C-alpha cells in the first residue's frame, strides 16, 4: 500500500494508528491542509455530543469547515480519501445496524459527522474522487484525557479505583460494543488495505453487553467497594445521549477481520493502567 497522509495524527486514535504503522504513514502537521500521497486518512474531529452546552460552533468549525478546506485539496487528483466517522451517525438507539441502514443523528457532534459524510460523498462523486467511510463504535484504551463525556469507561474505572460511587443513567441497562483502540487501528489498516472504495464500513468488535455489567465486571476485577447508583437520564441529555450502540460488522469480517483482545482482557488491562 502507498504511503498514507494522516490528518489528526496527534489525537487518541490517530496517534495510536501512527505508532502501530510508522512505515505506512506521513503525519500531516496541524496547520497544513495539503498532502502529496495517494491516500489520506482523516481523523480530525470533535468527540462528544456534549459541546452543545458550551460552544455551539466547535462541532461545525471542526467537523465541517476545516474538513471541507482539506477535502478541497483533493480536486483533480487521483487519491483515496479515507474518512473516520462514527457509529453515532445512526442515532441514539442503535442495535446491530448495518452500513446501509438509515441515519438519524440527534446531537451536534453526530449531526455534523453525518453531514460531513454526505458532503464527502457529494464532492467525491462530483469530481471523480475515491473515498471510504469508516464508522467507529465505542473505543476503549488508556487515555490521560478521560472525562464523563470522553472515554467514559476509563473515567468510570478511575472512580472505581478510588471506591467512589458510580452513577449510571437508567441503571446502565443499555447495550454497548466496546473495542480496544489497537483493534480499531488494526481494522482501519485492513480496510485501507483490502476495503472497496466508495463504500462504508462499520468498525466494532461485533459483541456487546450491558454497560452495567461491564462496570460490575471492572468493579470485581479491582475489588472495589464503589456503590452503583441508578439515576434517571437528565432531561437535557435524553435527546442527544446515545443509549444502545451495537454495529453489524459482516462487511468487516468479510475482509478477514477478527479482534485480538476481548473485552474481559481489555478490562483487566484498563484496571492496571488507570
Task: List each model region and its residues.
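N-terminal Rossmann NAD(P)H-binding glycine-rich loop of SDR-like oxidoreductase domains
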Residues: 3-22
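SDR active-site strand-loop-helix element
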Residues: 7, 43-46, 81-87, 134-136
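Short acidic low-complexity segments
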Residues: 25-37, 229, 262
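NAD(P)H-binding glycine-rich loop region in Rossmannoid oxidoreductase-like domains
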Residues: 34-62, 73, 88-89
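Conserved Rossmann-fold NAD(P)-dependent oxidoreductase catalytic core, especially the SDR/UDP-sugar
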Residues: 68-108
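Active-site helix of classical SDR
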Residues: 112-115
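NAD(P)-dependent short-chain dehydrogenase/reductase
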Residues: 121-176, 181-186, 190, 217-219
